[in-house]
UniProtKB/Swiss-Prot annotation:
Keyword Cytoplasm on entry: no
Membrane topology: Peripheral membrane protein
Oligomeric form and interacting partners: F-type ATPases have 2 components, CF(1) - the catalytic core - and CF(0) - the membrane proton channel. CF(1) has five subunits: alpha(3), beta(3), gamma(1), delta(1), epsilon(1). CF(0) has three main subunits: a(1), b(2) and c(9-12). The alpha and beta chains form an alternating ring which encloses part of the gamma chain. CF(1) is attached to CF(0) by a central stalk formed by the gamma and epsilon chains, while a peripheral stalk is formed by the delta and b chains.
One GO MF term attached to the UniProt entry: ATP hydrolysis activity
UniProt-recorded name of the protein: ATP synthase subunit beta
Gene: atpD
Positions contributing to ATP binding: G161, G162, A163, G164, V165, G166, K167, T168
Family under the similarity heading: Belongs to the ATPase alpha/beta chains family.
Amino acid sequence: MVSKNTTDKKKNQSIGKVIQVLGSVVDVKFSENSIPKIYDALIVDNNGKKLVLEVEQNIGDEIVRTIAMGPTEGLKRGLDVINTNSPITAPTGMEVLGRMFNVLGDPIDEKPDLDVKREPIHKDAPKYEELVTTTEILETGIKVIDLMIPFTKGGKVGLFGGAGVGKTILIQELINNIAKAHNGVSVFAGVGERTREGNDLYHEFIEAGVLNKTCLVFGQMNEPPGARMRVALTGLTIAEYFRDQKNMDVLLFIDNIFRFTQAGSEVSALLGRMPSAVGYQPTLSTEMGSLQERITSTKNGSITSVQAVYVPADDLTDPAPATTFTHLDARIVLDRSIASLGIYPAVDPLASSSRVLDPEIVGQEHYDIALRVQIALQKYQDLQSIIAILGMDELSEEDKLIVQRARKIRNFLSQSFFVGEKFTGRPGVFVKVNDTVRSFKSILDGEVDYIPETYFLYSSIIDDVIEKYNKDKDK
């Protein structure tokens, strides 16, 4: 949808004609004095349906090249195209909470349209003097994240993993925990993912009672590349309103940032640009930067972002995930080998990292325990090849103890999720950071060496492990 301020003023609108349609790319010719600006939204009536085009290039001779935000089937040469003199706009205001929109800010939840102020989706990043750096830790209630990969309010977290290792369910759990524990507002941008997942997410939010704290924006994988490329900006514009106008701390979830890059690659090819490395667009870094630089903390409030990053063929050196890395404060890497052991969330604590795992930010004890956990898991990984060839019996007593504790730590990093209750039958748990640190300290100090490793799987805190063991022992 476009701004009412512009659509109502006929005298400011210029009319062009469709002269060429190439898939999602539409060329439009205007008169000499009325050529639209880059990123202006144009409207064409396509068999009774409003189709929005976004200007991407001025190719000379009064012709602009545009990308369609919807299907172009049925579009004919010679059709009238109206220039709105405004970019695509997104709805803003508290009224958007509990609602679901498409890339144009039109409701897709079968509820009435909203009569609210709209903001253009293309904006400059906040100026340097408006920025603020905060080091306030955001407690997620997920043990492996709070202990090993803590992140701050206003930080950016990347969620890396291949297909089917649990990225989306981890995002759902974070939304659930933040809404319930911090009374926070979330904006979820579904970028180029499955429609079924969006539908499931919407109904799960209703069941969990967190929909009224969330706004959902979707551009699914069946939609044209223009919609998939711009939907992240629509979600970000809505989040910016809560930060800048309401002085709130907002959570922006993007699932999946790779699809943003992928859509940009498709658009780039359609526009005739020469591809860069591995076939990606030559403007990859610029496009990513223009999105990521707007996701930041200002003196008004903060936008904390969690971005799921699909890693093609599990290759972290691929240009799409590699470009995303440069903007992140923390990265959570999900590993298929951990998922295959039945341990969820399948976070790899050794491949994951956070710049805020620092004694001055999280405290000395937390930092020391996290470091000891990393060392134990690294030693276990180093010993695995020996165990595979010679077996556990060939290890020294000291190494056997390291392996036993590391396996308990590995199992204890698993956790039951609220959003997974109906699939697993296990009730979800929110674990406080202090309980997490205390529990892992007990394992590392050898206080629970007598308890077999199976008791640590899907236990919330160390007290639960001891209680379960004692209950079975008394039988």
